[in-house]
């Protein structure tokens, strides 16, 4: 199954920050070995950039970044986060990385309460830090933290300053998730106009549940890179979900994302297991119910042609189709489920089994395929002994 709607041959880069922004979520603390294992899975998945961590923040982060680079640095771009200060940049250089992600906030609230700096001082810091990193031969991505709450004129000035200093990419973070798609589209359109041939990236948080939608809007406005995390993990309400962004770009907009999508479910479960953060049951793409069906009309349609009630095939993302049993079930779904277990009933028997299943479900019981099989065997035996 190809693109569902329009086709666009342009490439969109996938920048995975599961190991940095994702791990910043409270309660997620991966060991160095676990971070390496996740990084290997991400490289296998085919993302373009892996943000391995924040090397200057701790000795553990420094060592993890070094080891990730040594393990997969020949397969994928590995980068590290850095504040716009010389000591952070030096620490990142010491890991052996050839790529760095430098940030400093541009919103007035951050300047006043966190940085205690003037706008002019911030612009000077941007130029000096980006230039310093470039002078050391690094690929530089610059992020104006809290960009979406920044004065627009000043934000554009900060972006231009980073470009003048030699930045290779400009990333626009919606740090506290206050954008909606229409507003973000307008902002990214303006950023793209002042960046020339530089890659514009977006980094969206999910505080209002719009991280994926905003990321897609950013790409539609001209961004050519998206920051994501596996399962959308991250601080507060999380980040844009890798699996949602990848499949939306590929199937709805026809972009080349370069990701082996058949590994999405597997990687999702792997990260969930290591972090201890479960995947929501109704999670798009990788949730247990993402391709689940119970209602009789839906199940009948899916059996005849899965596209009647599925926008993509579960196999494309490594997930599975699940036919559930309950008070909404119909005879077609039951027949398929039983036949998959080697049980073949006539219509009269099927109706009898279905009646008992619905009775159990309406009483609040969960009915499994094993339950259906047991009921079917009971119906068969009743006919034999009759």
UniProtKB/Swiss-Prot annotation:
Q: Which GO terms describe its molecular function?
A: 2-isopropylmalate synthase activity; metal ion binding
**What is the protein's known function?**
Catalyzes the condensation of the acetyl group of acetyl-CoA with 3-methyl-2-oxobutanoate (2-oxoisovalerate) to form 3-carboxy-3-hydroxy-4-methylpentanoate (2-isopropylmalate). Carries out the first step of the leucine biosynthesis pathway. Also displays a low citramalate synthase activity, using pyruvate as substrate, but is unable to use 2-oxoglutarate.
> Known catalysed reaction(s)?
3-methyl-2-oxobutanoate + acetyl-CoA + H2O = (2S)-2-isopropylmalate + CoA + H(+)
**Which pathway is recorded for this entry?**
Amino-acid biosynthesis; L-leucine biosynthesis; L-leucine from 3-methyl-2-oxobutanoate: step 1/4
Q: Name one GO biological process term.
A: L-leucine biosynthetic process
Q: Which cofactor does it need?
A: a divalent metal cation
Pfam short name (any one): HCS_D2
What UniProt keywords apply to this chain's record, in alphabetical order? Acyltransferase, Amino-acid biosynthesis, Branched-chain amino acid biosynthesis, Leucine biosynthesis, Metal-binding, Transferase
| Ranges of residues in domain Pyruvate carboxyltransferase | 12-265
**Knockout consequences:** Cells lacking this gene exhibit very retarded growth in MM and the addition of isoleucine does not affect the growth of this mutant, whereas the addition of leucine appears to improve growth in MM.
Tell me what this protein is called: 2-isopropylmalate synthase
The residues listed in the UniProt record as binding a divalent metal cation, with positions renumbered to this chain, are: 21, 203, 205, 239
- InterPro entries, alphabetically? 2-IPM_HCS-like, AIPM/Hcit_synth_CS, Aldolase_TIM, IPMS, LEU1_arch, LeuA/HCS_post-cat, PYR_CT
EC number(s) stated in the UniProt entry for this protein = 2.3.3.13
Quaternary structure, from the entry: Homodimer.
Locate the transmembrane regions by residue number: none
Notes on activation and inhibition: Is not inhibited by leucine.
Of which family is this protein a member? Belongs to the alpha-IPM synthase/homocitrate synthase family.
């Amino acid at each position: 199954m190809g693109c569902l709607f329009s086709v666009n041959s342009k490439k969109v880069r996938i920048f995975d920050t599961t190991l940095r922004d994702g791990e910043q979520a409270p309660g997620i603390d991966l060991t160095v070995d676990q971070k390496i294992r996740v990084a290997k899975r991400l490289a296998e998945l085919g993302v373009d950039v892996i943000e391995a961590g924040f090397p200057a923040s701790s000795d553990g982060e420094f060592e993890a970044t070094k080891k990730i680079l040594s393990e997969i640095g020949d397969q994928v771009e590995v980068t590290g986060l850095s504040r716009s200060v010389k000591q952070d940049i030096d620490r990142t250089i010491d890991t052996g990385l050839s790529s760095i992600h430098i940030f400093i906030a541009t919103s007035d609230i951050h300047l006043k309460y966190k940085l205690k700096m003037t706008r002019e001082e911030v612009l000077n810091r941007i130029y000096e830090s980006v230039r310093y990193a470039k002078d050391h031969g690094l690929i530089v991505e610059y992020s104006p933290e809290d960009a979406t709450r920044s004065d627009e004129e000043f934000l554009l000035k900060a972006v231009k300053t980073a470009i003048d200093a030699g930045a290779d990419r400009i990333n626009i973070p919606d740090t506290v998730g206050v954008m909606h798609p229409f507003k973000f589209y307008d902002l990214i359109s303006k950023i793209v106009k002042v960046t020339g041939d530089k890659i514009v990236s977006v980094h969206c948080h999910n505080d209002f549940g719009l991280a994926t939608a905003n990321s897609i809007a950013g790409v539609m406005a001209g961004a050519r890179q998206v920051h994501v995390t596996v399962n959308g993990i991250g601080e507060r309400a999380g980040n844009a979900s890798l699996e949602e962004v990848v499949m939306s770009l590929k199937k709805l907009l026809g972009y080349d994302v370069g990701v082996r999508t058949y590994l999405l479910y597997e990687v999702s479960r792997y990260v969930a297991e290591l972090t201890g953060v479960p995947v929501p049951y109704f999670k798009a793409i990788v949730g247990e119910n993402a391709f689940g069906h119970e209602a009789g009309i839906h199940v009948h349609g899916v059996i005849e042609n899965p596209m009647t009630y599925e926008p993509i095939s579960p196999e494309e993302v490594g997930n599975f189709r699940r036919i559930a049993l309950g008070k909404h079930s119909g005879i077609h779904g039951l027949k398929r489920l039983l036949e998959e277990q080697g049980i073949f009933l006539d219509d009269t028997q099927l109706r009898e089994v279905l009646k008992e299943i619905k009775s159990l479900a309406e009483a609040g019981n969960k009915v499994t395929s094993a339950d259906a099989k047991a009921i079917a065997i009971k119906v068969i035996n009743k006919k034999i002994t009759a």
